[in-house]
Structure formats: C-alpha cells, structure tokens
Amino acid sequence: MAADSDLRYYLGVKNAFLGHLNPQLNEASILYRNLGGAKFKDVSSEMNLVDLGWSGDATPIDGNNDGWPDLYVLSMQGHDEYYENVGGKRFEKKSRDVFPKTPWGAMGVKAFDFNNDLAVDLFLTDMHSDMSEDVGPEREKMKSRMQFGEEVLRSNGQSIFGNAFYQADGKGGFSEISDKIGAENYWPWGLSVADLNADGFQDAFLTSSMCFPYRYGVNSVLINEQGERFADAEFIVGIEPRANGQRIKPWFELDADELDVENRYCKDRTGKVVVWSALGSRSSAIFDLDDDGDLDIVTSEFNSEPMVLLSDLSDKKKINFLKIKLVGGESNRDALGARVVLKIGDRRLLQVYDGVSGYLSHSLHPLYFGLGESSQVDEIEIVWPSGKTETKIGPLDANQTLTIKENG
C-alpha cells in the first residue's frame, strides 16, 4: 500500500524458473566504468556488452592472449556468452565461435592454469542440470541424463549437461575435457582454486548440496595430478564427512493440528511436525588462515554457521611455498588483473590475480604458490594491469611472504 492509500499490485510470474524463455523480460547485466571519486558509469551499450541471459556470475580471462581482458558470462539456464575485448574500445560476441557448447545451468567459474603451460584454462560448474532428475551416489561423477524437454532447454544441441573444463591451446582456442580429467561432481555451486598440497599444481574445491527438499551433496576436493587429471580427495583429506557426520538440521516447523493441517507433510500426523533440510555449502575462500604455510578453507553455509577447515599438511611434511602480496601503483590499488609467473629452473608457474573465489564471491589475499621440492625461486615476472612488466631477480627463498609494489 502506498502513502496515498491507493493499492498497488505486483503479479508474480508462475514459471519464474523458466525466465530464460522470455529474455525480453530480464534485466540486462551491466558493465560499469570506474570514473574515479567513487563514481561509476553504465557503459554496457557503448561497449557492445548487452547481455539478457539469466546470469549469476562472470569472469575476466584473456582468452586470445592480446593483453586485454575478455569476458565469459555465465547463464544459469541456457547458453553462456563470451565477449572478446577489442583494444579496450568495445566487446565483440564470440560465444559459439570459441565455445561451441557450454553448460546449460552454469553457476560458478574460475580461470587458472591447470597444467602449468602458461595458458589460462576455464573451469565451470553446472548445478541446474542436476535438477532434472534424482540420482544416487553412483552417478554423482557423471553428466546429467537431462530430463527437461527441448521446449525448456532451447539447447539446439549446444549444451553440456554438467560441469565443463576448457583447456586453452595458447592461441585463443579451447578444448572441452571435463570427463577426460574427472571434473564432474554433483549439485555444485561455485569453486575455489588453490594449491592445497603445495606441489606446484592448482587444485579445486567445489561447494555443493541443496536445501529442502533435496538430499545432501558432498563438497568436492579435486587434487590436480601433475596437470593430467583431477583425483577425488574430499574423504581422504577430511573434508567429508562433516563433523559428527551431520548432514541435516531442522528447517522449519508445521502445525499439523490447525494452521498446516492440509500440508502434505502433516498427513496422518498431529502436533508439531519438524521438517528437516540438508546442510549445504554455498561459497568458499582458501587462504592460510593460521599462517602455518599450508592452505585452509572457510565456507559459507546455507541455514548454518560457516565451516572452518584447517589443514595440517605442514605438520605432516616439509612443504615449500611463496606468498606474494601485490600493491598497485599506476594500476588499481589491489593489482587485480595482474599476471604473475614464477620461474623455478625449467618450471613456470602462472597465476592471474582476479580475486575470484567461490560462488558470487571475491577475496583479497596474497597469491600462494606451492613450490614442491624447490626451496628457492629464480625469478618473478609481473605484468601489471597497467600493462607494465616488472621482473624480480632471485634467488628468492621459499616460505616467506613477499610484498611487491608496482614501480617499487
């Protein structure tokens, strides 16, 4: 009711879950240009970046290696979109040209170098494809046997019904290899990527599960086996099962005698009826919480308090690592967008500092490089967001935090 006592009505859409079928009703994603002084300008149309998909996330990635960040935009139902940055002047849609098939129900994304070839790969999680059927644990590592019809999917044969992993060829092309490397899991939200075992290859942590009325889904730890494939490790490293084996908790209460007597959960029951729901993680951050040299995980939870998962790796074995904190000068303060390469003998370790961590989340913390058996780094090369390249010559000792300032 408005202040003038005139009634206002809002009509909900019955098939809101199928909003992708009517993109003309959607709000467009917006690109804001930072003008400085806490002012921003909508430049979506000006930059040819008008996207009407049901998007919950996006990630920058320099897919064609021209030094300009391109943009991969997720769609929670339908086709993802990919826009190439044309010299910072505009974007060109290259979606199907570069990615012929994309996840139908994409929820999370992370760009990182999987196999240490200095090319940035792309890992996407797909949750909504898992909603089309109930499956048991035996199918959790398999693609969905999609049960929605084409009238809902609008796929035209261009969808992947599960997670996708696009391996970059370093020339602007990508190959989808999710099944080959074991990148599938069940009911994922977002993912965080970090070197959990400090061997020099980045691993992945995928938050999973859904609340009432769906069942519990385990959080996944995917250990990177030397850039060849992922190995499932959530039960080995102690992420699963949860503390005390807890997978559910009370969700809400019904009154089977009066208010909720017609509810299907109150049939043949009296008094108060407690409805239980599965626990589930939504997002995560990976960093060295207790400053002991290994990486810990903090999750955000639905209908529950956060989980703090402390690693004891450094208590069990000698590890080598290097943390790098970047401080922008000419670039943005946090140096978001910087590209860092460590040179260790014949090895090259690449990370792009984009802050992306978990579902709809960003985190600012030092870059963490696991060094394997190496106790020193020969050289660090940084390409700052400003375009400037700086090199820090070693040898640089492992097991420390370096603060590197642009033009410092």
What are these model-predicted stretches?
Residues 61, 74, 112, 125, ...:
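Surface-exposed loop and edge beta-strand positions of immunoglobulin-like domains
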Residues 29-31, 79-82, 131, 163, ...:
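Structural signal for beta-propeller blades
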Residues 173, 228-229, 233-238, 250, ...:
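Gly/Ser/Thr/Pro-enriched helix-cap/hinge segments flanking short amphipathic alpha-helices
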Residues 33, 55-65, 69, 84, ...:
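Beta-propeller blade termini
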